[in-house]
């Protein structure tokens, strides 16, 4: 399972789900579902989200048990 810190980073950057979704080219619901861990993001989506925040993917997404 992949855990994420999308919500934390959105708060740091003062971004609403709608704005992040617009920047990465998805619907707001997609961001909400990823934040809640309902679905794992595609590699492209994970990459684009990390790019918006200017951090490596592993700063936002972690594979549980990958220590």
Show where each model-derived region lies.
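Short, conserved catalytic or interaction motifs in soluble domains
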Residues: 36, 55, 65
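Recognition helix of helix-turn-helix/homeodomain-like DNA-binding domains
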Residues: 26-39
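Short, charged recognition helix plus adjacent turn
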Residues: 51, 61-67
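Flexible coil/turn residues that form the inter-helical turn or adjacent wing/linker of helix-turn-helix
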Residues: 2, 13, 42, 53
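Short basic helix-loop element that most often maps to the first helix and adjoining turn
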Residues: 4-23
């Amino acid at each position: 399972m992949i855990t994420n810190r999308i919500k934390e980073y959105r708060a740091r950057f003062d971004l609403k789900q709608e704005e992040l979704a617009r920047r990465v080219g998805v619907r707001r619901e997609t961001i909400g579902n990823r934040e809640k861990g309902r679905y794992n993001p595609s590699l492209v989506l994970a990459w684009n989200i990390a790019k918006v925040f200017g951090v490596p993917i592993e700063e936002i997404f972690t594979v549980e048990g990958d220590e």
